[in-house]
């Protein structure tokens, strides 16, 4: 099974994968942890979108079809898990281009943050999997505040894809911890 103690891995970093519903506080928690543990690096799944030309036809209806999880695993997550430096180029959807290379030194804590961070393609490169959730009403409130006028499109497109991914791969059920942030305010 996946049971493993930190003491069993003295030469490798702790890799904490934070997945969960949009608006549940994944990025906020990752940022808080990074501040609390300066000897850490944070990898964002949002840095690994596929350029539109590389996406499969009908990607809008297929969970995770807009993500380059192979590249995330091979260029960033696996080296970080092995205690090696990481170098990768994030893809910016806003700019429609890859950004300059990011270089991250090996650290004892690696925070993998974002939707799809518990995807089966990434299994084996994490130590601890945490799923964040919140009540639907709270998710709506948070997303409206975050997305503003883009909320309707966001809710119609991304929320169903995410929920499909959770159901298909039993993401909450296979997490080591499930954290409900409904009462957490802005976490």
Model-derived features: positions:
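P-loop (Walker A) phosphate-binding loop of NTP-binding proteins
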Residues: 21
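Small-molecule kinase domains that catalyze NTP-dependent phosphoryl transfer to phosphate-bearing small molecules
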Residues: 97, 119, 149-187
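Conserved lysine of the Walker
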Residues: 26
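ATP-dependent NMP and nucleoside kinases share a basic, alpha-helical "lid"
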Residues: 97-146
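Conserved nucleotide-sensing/catalytic segment adjacent to the nucleotide-binding pocket
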Residues: 54-96, 109
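Hydrophobic positions on the alpha1 helix immediately C-terminal to the Walker A/P-loop
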Residues: 29
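Short beta-strand-centered segment that lines the nucleotide-binding/catalytic pocket of NTP-utilizing
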Residues: 39-53
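Short, small-residue-biased leader/transition segments that mark boundaries at the very start
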Residues: 1-6
């Amino acid at each position: 099974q996946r049971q493993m103690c930190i003491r069993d891995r003295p030469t490798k970093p702790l890799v904490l994968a934070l997945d969960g519903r949009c608006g549940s506080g994944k990025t906020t928690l990752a940022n808080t942890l990074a501040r609390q543990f300066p000897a850490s690096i944070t990898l964002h799944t949002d840095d690994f979108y596929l350029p539109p030309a590389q996406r499969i036809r009908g990607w809008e209806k297929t969970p995770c079809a807009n993500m380059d999880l192979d590249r995330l695993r091979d260029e960033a997550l696996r080296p970080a898990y092995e205690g090696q430096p990481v170098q990768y180029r994030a893809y910016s959807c806003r700019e429609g281009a890859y950004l300059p290379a990011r270089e991250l030194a090996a650290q004892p804590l690696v925070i993998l943050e974002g939707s799809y961070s518990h995807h089966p393609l990434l299994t084996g490169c994490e130590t601890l999997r945490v799923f964040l959730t919140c009540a639907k009403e709270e998710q709506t409130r948070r997303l409206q505040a975050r997305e503003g006028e883009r909320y309707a499109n966001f809710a119609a497109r991304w929320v169903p894809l995410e929920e499909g991914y959770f159901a298909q791969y039993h993401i909450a059920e296979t997490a080591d911890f499930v954290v409900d942030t409904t009462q957490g305010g802005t976490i």
